[in-house]
Amino acid sequence: MTRSPEADALSRVSAHAVPPRGTAVRHAEFRGPLFAEWGSEMREEALGATVGSATAETLRERVRIPSIDRRDVWADADPITIERITAAAEADRGRPWADALGSLFARYVRDGDRATYERAVSDRQERLTRAVAVAAVTDQQTWIDEAADGAVVLCEQSTWSLPAHDDAHARRGFVLPDVISPYLDLVAGEIAAQLAVADRILGPRWDESWPGLRERIRHEAETRVFTPFETRDDLWWLGYWREVNNWNPWILGNVLLAAVLLLDDAERVARILARALDSLDRYVAELPGDGAIDEGVAYWWNGAGRMLEMLDTVAAITDGGLDATRIPVVGETLRFPMRMHLGGDWYVNVADGWARSRGHEPWQFPFRWGSLTGDGRVTEWARAARRPGQPVADVAGGLPRLVRALVDTAWRDAVAAAAPLPAAVWLPSVQVLVRRSAAGSVAGLALAAKGGTNDENHNHKDLGSFLVAAGGRQLLVDVGKPTYTAQTFSAERYRIRAMQSGWHSAPAPYGLEQGEGPAFTAQVITAPQGEPGPVSPAGEAALLELELGGAYPLVAGDSWRRTFRFDGSGSAGGTERIEVADRWRLSEDGAHRVHLIAAGEVTPSGDVVEVAADGHRIRITADDGNAPVVPSLEVWELDDPELIAVWGPRLTRLVYDVGGRVGSFTTVIEELS
């Protein structure tokens, strides 16, 4: 299916957007949850009187980024983290900085490759982050120079925007960036904030040994970030002409932090803050009351998580005047990833999300927010990732996040805790169920099932799909995110196997793929209980029934019902039992398929299939109401490095062939000890 240019610009899975011809693009005042909490105090006039009346240095002090002159703070930075960073920084020195060549930038348009250029830019950023951290701790000229070199390298980079995001090709047909009209994307905001934090920390030493560098940083930030932010209403992620996603808080938070640290005009900072809050309110307004993020946990860190970090910055800049900790949706959103935790580094993943933690999540900020809101389960969830002898943060999270973690002594001293692992979660806004037999334990099975729509951010065609974990480890899986290319956010997105409904554990009436867009939905017939709503009593079976006929291009009135039942009390054999029952009534006879996607060793034996990985095993049986159904097995030999990192060398699709205008099919999953 190919979207029209107009539909593509408004799609939740388009790469970036230039407003369709005739679209009204204007900034009109917005009133959402933030305005409901703060009222006119978040508007420019009030902020001009509060923030604008402070000195620029007072505002900088409030955001808690310590200068290199704060030797007491840097002497107390986590030694384990600094030791790791120093070792990597020593390896950096003496080698050339990565080349972000024009030919690499042009590959996005020429052959669809975006990863090679992105790796070069990321390498530059991470090397600079390491250099700044080591310079701050050691106060040695060698490292101050290394950091200055990195700052100059980024200042001389033609663009801070990525080729997959830059609008120069859409506007002017360029394969290179338009340096006259720079685009403000995620990475432009990241680099501006990174340079601003570096300037805040090392500025006193750069004044002595690198005069002119700080002025260069300010010039580039002005040209590439502040001026576009203040003058361009067509930037789609501002929310003035289309819906927003994780780009909104991610960019806004970085722009705001950079403005506070680099601008000497407090009144201008107040104006930027007012514009940023008006835009952020549009993002907060799209968050559902249950706190669910339709992009999943992987994007929570760089979406809702960025919102939390920005709100922390807002509270700091306003000296506590604008405090978001009491806004209900903020608290529910904070709890979302904790509710999706399967155990260890495994999570319920949807859309373009990974099933496993990548190992460099910035755990300090949910720990801090759990403390700010008094939510002990959130702090416990964060502490579950705080392993003895391991760094408090990773450079991959960026310099601002690294510095906040390094100087947070409460996070440094936090002791590992057991993850809360809620027993029952039901998020009606995205129709996601998570169920296990007992809270706080990975023992036994866990079920996650999903309804929703095929118009979600970073959408996969996954309506009616489910995953099963044993001992916290996914065995029936959601494939998740492969490496991004130009195809990923184009009209050809659903040619990618991982995003097709046929490669989710979902049915395929007549062998069909699910449809694309808001018209294709699942309907909840019977909803389970689970937090943040009422929770079923311990031992009571969970039941979710979905109507999936609307997920497929079927004749009106055709029905495909799927019912999920989780029985934590155990089957007759003494094991927990998950039952997935399909019933259909269609207008015509035909052949249908039911798919299961498995990770690990898949062993068929008669009408039983066993799946095993990392010492955990499940058995799968299926029948059509008359006799057992034996699946055929299709092996996907993975060649994508991101998928291999999660699943190993292969995935296996179990294909059950069924048929009839009317019929039923039941799948049973049990744990094997």
List PLM regions with ranges.
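Long, well-ordered core segments of solenoidal/helical folds
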Residues: A89-A100, A147-H165, G212-W237, R271-G291, ...
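Solvent-exposed loop and edge beta-strand segments that line ligand/cofactor-binding
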Residues: G112-Q125, A136, R172-G189, D234-P249, ...
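Structural helix-adjacent loops and short alpha-helical linkers that scaffold large soluble proteins
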Residues: A135-A148, A198-H219, A259-L277, V314-V330, ...
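CBM-like, beta-strand-rich accessory domains located in the C-terminal region of large
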Residues: H165-A168, G189, A382-A396, P482-S673
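Active-site lining segments of carbohydrate-active enzymes
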Residues: F174-G296, E309, A410-A416
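Carbohydrate-active enzyme catalytic cores, enriched for enzymes
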Residues: A304-L475, W647-P649, G659
